[in-house]
């Protein structure tokens, strides 16, 4: 997979499009099949989540496929003017096409939080530096700990949360409306901040701001020589992370626990491709380790036979990721 700069795009390159919109969709279940049909007809891969509160997800296809999907969404009465952010690659970073029905399009787990009723103040990327340079502003990264580990804004507070569900409790324990008069928040594409700023407003915080379009929009619009971003930005696809040019970054992913890892970390004794890394070595049972090793063997055999991403190799990787996700959940429950 090789990153592509926007100026060098051709019709054969892949667009990676993150999109979301909070909107009342009382009959969202009826959208699933026609939306999936449009994605499949245009060879769009990735996952879209739909719920009564809106739509969210990241998909990829060649330019024509993405344009056709966005055109279809625009024609739906409630789904016009969707927030989108694009990056580019020479390969599709997804293996499958999915539309999932959900209770929430981003899971916070707090009843009654509605960004359509109350939300923080949006701050444009070109105005963000000035805001977070204000000494009276507390800057909070609302993402998960493994995302923050590889990159964040200068002087940002890390809540050390493993999932977004943990954020409300962290905020209750660490933030006070009487002390923290100005709160600025950010996330990857903006959607988590729609919920987190709405929650903060509900908790009595007055001046609550969030980065419009998230980190991805900031990296797109703010020049590198003016940036206050440090590191790379984690993304939830096969690229793992993107750099300031929105090109694939320097991180790989442990397929046992899905954590980002560097080339140097692959040299550690705990790392075995597809089986374990220093993040998960103590959380993987012998039985899981054996399964992961067998799955990795299948992947390598498929690669040796020259089978493509939609063949046995992809199926092996998908099964491996499913097992890794279950193993990660079990490890968290046991703590």
Curated annotation (Swiss-Prot):
<comment type="function">
    <text>Catalyzes oxygen-dependent 5-hydroxyuridine (ho5U) modification at position 34 in tRNAs.</text>
</comment>
<feature type="domain" description="Rhodanese">
    <location>
        <begin position="133"/>
        <end position="227"/>
    </location>
</feature>
<dbReference type="InterPro" id="IPR040503">
    <property type="entry name" value="TRHO_N"/>
</dbReference>
<dbReference type="GO" id="GO:0016705">
    <property type="term" value="F:oxidoreductase activity, acting on paired donors, with incorporation or reduction of molecular oxygen"/>
</dbReference>
<keyword id="KW-0560">Oxidoreductase</keyword>
<dbReference type="Pfam" id="PF17773">
    <property type="entry name" value="UPF0176_N"/>
</dbReference>
<feature type="active site" description="Cysteine persulfide intermediate">
    <location>
        <position position="187"/>
    </location>
</feature>
<dbReference type="InterPro" id="IPR036873">
    <property type="entry name" value="Rhodanese-like_dom_sf"/>
</dbReference>
<dbReference type="InterPro" id="IPR020936">
    <property type="entry name" value="TrhO"/>
</dbReference>
<dbReference type="GO" id="GO:0006400">
    <property type="term" value="P:tRNA modification"/>
</dbReference>
<comment type="similarity">
    <text>Belongs to the TrhO family.</text>
</comment>
<keyword id="KW-0819">tRNA processing</keyword>
<protein>
    <recommendedName>
        <fullName>tRNA uridine(34) hydroxylase</fullName>
        <ecNumber>1.14.-.-</ecNumber>
    </recommendedName>
</protein>
<dbReference type="Pfam" id="PF00581">
    <property type="entry name" value="Rhodanese"/>
</dbReference>
<dbReference type="InterPro" id="IPR001763">
    <property type="entry name" value="Rhodanese-like_dom"/>
</dbReference>
